[in-house]
């Protein structure tokens, strides 16, 4: 990987995008935590994260029926 690629900071904040979609769907943090099998506090921590593990992102995408990977696909095209 070249230096230009290594120093590139992510433009998107995945936690904020997940939070926005959850609110758009009018779902509660409690509902989302139950679906993820975790505590509400972990959901709030997720909202603050700028990066995410792909397996977790897949689970989130399935739960919310929303392709969050699409944001990363768009980043690749820029």
Residue ranges of model-derived segments:
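Recognition helix of helix-turn-helix/homeodomain-like DNA-binding domains
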Residues: 37-52
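A short, Lys/Arg-rich alpha-helix, primarily the initiator
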Residues: 1-27
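Short, basic-rich loop-to-helix N-cap that marks the start of a DNA-contacting helix
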Residues: 49-62
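Short alpha-helical "recognition helix" segments of helix-turn-helix
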Residues: 31-33
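Key DNA-contacting residues within the recognition helix of helix-turn-helix
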Residues: 19, 44-45, 72
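Short C-terminal boundary/hinge segments that cap the last helix of small helical domains
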Residues: 65-78
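Residues within the alpha-helical elements of helix-turn-helix
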Residues: 24, 35, 63
């Amino acid at each position: 990987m070249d230096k230009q690629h290594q120093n590139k900071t992510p433009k998107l904040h995945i936690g904020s995008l997940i939070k926005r979609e959850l609110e758009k769907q009018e779902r509660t943090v409690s509902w989302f935590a139950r679906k993820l099998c975790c505590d509400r506090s972990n959901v709030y921590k997720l909202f603050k994260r700028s990066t995410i593990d792909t397996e977790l992102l897949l689970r989130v995408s399935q739960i919310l029926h929303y392709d969050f990977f699409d944001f990363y696909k768009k980043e690749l095209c820029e």
